[in-house]
Amino acid sequence: MTAEFIIRLILAAIACGAIGMERQMRGKGAGLRTHVLIGMGSALFMIVSKYGFADVLSLDHVGLDPSRIAAQVVTGVGFIGAGNILVRNQNIVGLTTAADIWVTAAIGMVIGSGMYELGIYGSVMTLLVLEVFHQLTFRLMNKNYHLQLTLVNGNTVSMLDWFKQQKIKTDLVSLQENEDHEVVAIDIQLHATTSIEDLLRLLKGMAGVKGVSIS
């Protein structure tokens, strides 16, 4: 029986670790180790809850609810998830990580109870949701524009650095240098909540910018 429990722990570590690896690759605070530990811990609690009191439950005068320990895992993991939810620049961040921690605990519990296939399917579906919906949201929430900037000579590098500081993705298409100015063609990617009109207005008011056009 012990060997079977060890197998459950290993499967929980693998299934939950895959989710943690995806989170870590995206630079999230809760990464591989956190998810592996949550998955293994949930599996252990489930094993104890299901099998740990077999000798006591066989006694006539003892009545226990073996599901109580497992139920507390759901409550306990909520505190871990809540620690990942932050307010940054008036935006709430960490909700997805908090949700996948909650799901990770559920996967660990499922595998700990012996439902291997359900746990693996749950892990695969979680990875699909995290990856597919990330790509889908990225495509729907971002717009591409082509800008042509006329700058005072020597300002191209500082302008590209400014875009980077604003977290605006840029691709340099061409750079044409003249005697008193340089013409830079770039492709930019803006979040849907950022107004291109506001960006153009801001660029036109910057020192070293002689002209801006969009196509």
From Swiss-Prot:
It holds the Pfam family MgtC. NCBIfam families: PRK09977.1. It is a multi-pass membrane protein. Could be involved in magnesium uptake. The chain crosses the membrane at residues 1-21, 36-56, 67-87, 92-112, 118-138. It comes from Escherichia coli (strain K12). Disruption phenotype: Deletion of yhiD in addition to mgtA and corA leads to Mg(2+) auxotrophy. It is found in: Cell inner membrane. GO terms for cellular component: plasma membrane. The gene is yhiD. Belongs to the MgtC/SapB family. Keywords: Cell inner membrane, Cell membrane, Magnesium, Membrane, Transmembrane, Transmembrane helix, Transport. This is Putative magnesium transporter YhiD.
